[in-house]
A protein has these predicted regions:
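Composition- and surface-driven signal marking solvent-exposed, interaction-prone regions
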Residues: 16-19, 116-118, 141-142, 199-202
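A generic hydrophobic-helix recognition signal that picks specific residues
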Residues: 1, 132-135, 175-177
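Single conserved hydrophobic/aromatic residue that forms the stacking wall/gate
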Residues: 1-13
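Residues in well-ordered beta-strands of folded domains
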Residues: 104-105, 130, 137, 199-201
Length: 210
């Protein structure tokens, strides 16, 4: 996971610029150094994205998918992104923005981790990044205030389970944020392979060793 602990971390998480620059530079380096080999072996062109990446609120995305594809979900599911909505979001962003990446924001607090900071309306200050219809990143501004963090853990019935974690925040913690980038998923999508082939040592429900 890539984390930041600095004065401007909140703004960096909100505008997502750091991850855009990281992925753009990384894919440019892959294209420059291995683009020909990837095209020869997998028949795929390494595409370096333009910035900024498109951004959409989750509720607006569901509305757009219904209008565009007739895709609907029950109200109880609209606080999170379904697998089918992930897939359709790629078709939608390609058509309307000519882009392969899509940031999705404004998830339901019920569906996000207790340590995600929320705004004055209770909306988590985080996002998911979708590439080619697959989630590759979850990022967020983290809650650093002990009392707020404790309350959010209690709301999810986790206060006892994360007591050791909460104790650190009693001594003070600066504003911070971060994101976890799924390197295996990134490799899978880059080369057009299955996740089993993209990982060095695949782990799954039926494979724990070696």
């Amino acid at each position: 996971e890539i984390s930041e602990c600095l004065v401007g971390s909140e703004m960096c998480i909100r505008d997502r610029k750091m991850e855009e620059e990281l992925l753009t530079a990384g894919l440019q380096a892959v294209k420059d150094n291995y683009g020909d080999q990837i095209k020869e072996l997998f028949g795929l062109e390494v595409i370096v994205p333009t910035t900024p990446f498109p951004v959409v609120k989750l509720a607006d995305l569901y509305k757009a998918l219904e209008e565009e594809f007739g895709y609907t979900v029950d109200e109880s599911e609209k606080g999170d992104l379904t697998t089918e909505a992930e897939r359709l979001s790629y078709d939608w962003v390609k058509k309307h923005y000519g882009h392969e990446f899509l940031f999705i924001t404004d998830y339901s607090a019920e569906k996000r981790a207790f340590y995600h900071m929320r705004d004055e309306n209770g909306v988590p200050q985080g996002y998911d990044l979708i590439w080619r219809g697959v989630e590759i990143t979850t990022g967020a501004q983290r809650e650093h205030r002990y009392e707020v963090l404790k309350k959010q853990a209690e709301e999810k019935g986790l206060a006892d389970d994360v007591k050791f974690y909460l104790e650190f925040f009693q001594y003070g913690c600066p504003p911070h944020g971060g994101f976890g980038l799924g390197i295996d998923r990134l490799t899978m999508l880059l080369c057009g392979q299955s996740i089993k082939d993209a990982e060095f040592l695949f782990r799954g429900p039926n494979r724990l060793t070696p």
